[in-house]
Amino acid sequence: GDVYKRQEESIEKMVWKLGDTQAEDHPEVVSFGQFGEKLEHLTNGQIQVEIYPNSALGNHREMLESVQMGNLEITKCMSTDLSFYVEESAIFGLPYIFTSLEHMDACLIGGLKDWFNNLLAEKDLVVIAWLDAGSRSVYNSKNAINKMEDMNGLLLRVPENDVFMSSMAAFGATGTPMPMGDIYSALQTGVIDGAENAAPVLYSMKHYEVAKYFSLTEHIRTPDVLIMSKSYLE
């Protein structure tokens, strides 16, 4: 018993940092707390997870770079954010490519996630979990969107991704990249007319305070992912 205890104590305890851009009350961030508790239990306390929401460790690109360099253990991002490394990931941002959550899950289980991880492996990255971030819809301070023409002329914040910008152009609006943490003040001061994201983001980031109109366009459903360094995990 004493030998086993000494061996257990000799194992170095690890703290895994998990970075996200969302607010601490976003459903995904809340679930990360549960993930950390489960991991700590399964490893008998050898691995603990510290969560850093609200872009405390940088934007998506910066946190992905930190994971690659070994300075951050886990980050959550949209699957499309990985187009910085694997250009094929841009397909996840195509409008209406997934008709429902069930359709998206069927595609992932049917081989899409394995294909994607094989591409990421070449960049020393691996997806450890696929997450449903909800479908993205448009919200703005100018007008309700009941038909395509209502999008004309709107300046909307989008993620730093060419597919998102092209999609907004196809809808008649203009997409402009902007960090998550800057959206509220940009809406408040009129720098942008609106943004597009899932309803939980509208709520957790309090964008509803400065964007009067929420339109259930559900134009994009892109899965979120938890990312680690493949070599570190192995």
Regions found by a protein language model. Give the residues of each.
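N-terminal secretory/targeting leader peptides
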Residues: 5-103, 112, 118-234
